[in-house]
């Protein structure tokens, strides 16, 4: 029996690693061929760790991944418009992002980097759409597809 569990656990680890590899590969590839848009931001790597390695965690649920990223990026863009690039704008943006994720029950820790990226990079509202919303949606769809393929009897919680 131990051998059977050992094999199953290792297969799940391989599927998780392969899933993360493929997902970040495609996002990186799109980033390399699209000269007008940025597709890849560092928080996506952290999101993939949660989504692929601990997909049952409340923090890795599709709703949290998608809306956590959008709310956090929006917070950063808003504070940049209001206060520019300053220590207070970065601090307020991150605090506001945490507040929004808590009240909407969409906490996703990797998204906490988005307000900092938005302010330091002087990002506009377009940053929320591309790469944040587009990338987060890609990660969610990719992860749900992989979970459905590897565990066909598991319902897709969205």
Task: Describe each model-derived feature in a short phrase.
Residues 26-36, 56-58:
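Short, hydrophobic transmembrane alpha-helix segments
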Residues 52-53, 116-127:
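Interfacial segments of multi-pass membrane proteins
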Residues 33-44, 80, 86-92:
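Structural signature of hydrophobic alpha-helical transmembrane segments
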Residues 15-26, 44-48, 63, 67, ...:
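Hydrophobic faces of alpha-helical transmembrane segments in multi-pass integral membrane proteins
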Residues 84-108:
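Internal alpha-helical transmembrane segments of multi-pass membrane proteins
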Residues 147-158:
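Single conserved hydrophobic/aromatic residue that forms the stacking wall/gate
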Residues 48-58, 101-105:
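C-terminal ends of transmembrane helices
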């Amino acid at each position: 029996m131990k051998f059977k569990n050992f094999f199953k656990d290792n297969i799940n680890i391989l599927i998780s690693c392969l899933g993360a590899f493929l997902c970040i590969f495609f996002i990186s590839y799109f980033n390399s061929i699209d000269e007008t848009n940025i597709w890849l931001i560092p928080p996506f790597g952290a999101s993939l760790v949660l989504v692929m390695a601990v997909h049952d965690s409340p923090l890795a649920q599709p709703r949290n991944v998608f809306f956590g990223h959008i709310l956090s990026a929006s917070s950063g863009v808003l504070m940049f418009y209001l206060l520019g690039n300053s220590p207070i704008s970065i601090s307020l943006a991150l605090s506001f992002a945490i507040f929004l994720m808590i009240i909407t029950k969409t906490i996703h820790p990797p998204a906490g980097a988005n307000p900092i990226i938005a302010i330091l990079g002087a990002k506009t509202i377009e940053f929320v759409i591309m790469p944040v919303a587009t990338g987060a949606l890609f990660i969610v769809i990719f992860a749900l597809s992989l979970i459905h393929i590897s565990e066909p009897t598991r319902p897709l919680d969205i």
